[in-house]
Amino acid sequence: MTTIPDDPLGDRMKEYEMMEAGRRALPGLPLLVRLDGKAFHTFTKGLERPFDARLQRVMDATTRHLVKECGARIGYTQSDEISLVYHHEGKAEPFLGGRFQKLTSILAATATFVFNRQLAAELPEKAERMALFDCRAWVVPSLEEAANTFLWRELDASKNSVAMAAQARLSHADLQGLSTKQQQELLFQRHGINWNDYPARCKRGAWFHRVEVVRGFTTDELDKLPPLHAARKDPDLRVCLLYTSPSPRDRTRSRMPSSA
C-alpha cells in the first residue's frame, strides 16, 4: 500500500486561499450580480448621441448570453451595466456552487468575451479596442428585495437617460443644478424633444428572462435524430428547451424623436 506523504505547506497555503476564495452565497437566498463596463465613458467616445442603437444591441446580446448560458433567471441591462439574479429553490445547486470569487471572475470574463466578439459586426470602428467588465455579487434576504434591486436600477436608467438626452443638446451651464424633471422640460422648450417619445430601450433599458419549455419532438426533429436515439422508440419522450425572451414591453417598437 502506497503511503501518500503529508504536505503541510500545501495544506496551509490552500487553507489561506479558501478563507477568501471559498466564500459562498447563503443557500436559498436570491443572489444578485452586477457587471459594469470599465471606463466606458472613454470607450464610447465618438458614438452616436444620446443613444447608439449599435451599442445597445451589443449590450443586449451580452446580457442574453449570460442569462442563457450562465444560469441566471433574469437579466437587465442599461447604459454600460448588466444586472442578473440567481435563485434556486429547494436543493438545486446554485451556479458554480454560489462561490463568489469563481462566479464573479467567470461572469466578468464571459461578458468581456461576448461583448468584444460582437464589436466587429456592430461597432467596427471600436473593434481594435478591448472592452472590459468588472463584476460584483451579493445576496439579499428575499425575492421582494431582489425585485427592488432591479427597480432601483431601472429608475437609475430613466434618470441617466434624461441626462444623456439633455446633455446631447444643452450645455453644462444650461443644465447646472436642474432636476431630472427640469432637464426634461428644458429639452422640450429649447429643442422640441419630448423624452417620452424615445423607445423604451433608451428610457428604461432591456430585460431578458429565462424560459424553459418541455415538449415532444416534432416530426422534422425526429427525422434528424440519430437512428438509435431513444425518441425513435419512445414517442412520449420530452425535450427541454431553453430560451431567453425579452419582456413584452421591450418587444414594442417606437421611433426615435425626429429631432433627436
For each feature predicted by the language model, list its residue ranges.
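Catalytic "initiation/cleavage/transfer" segments centered on a nucleophilic residue
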Residues: 21, 122-236, 241-242
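Long, charge-dense
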Residues: 90-132
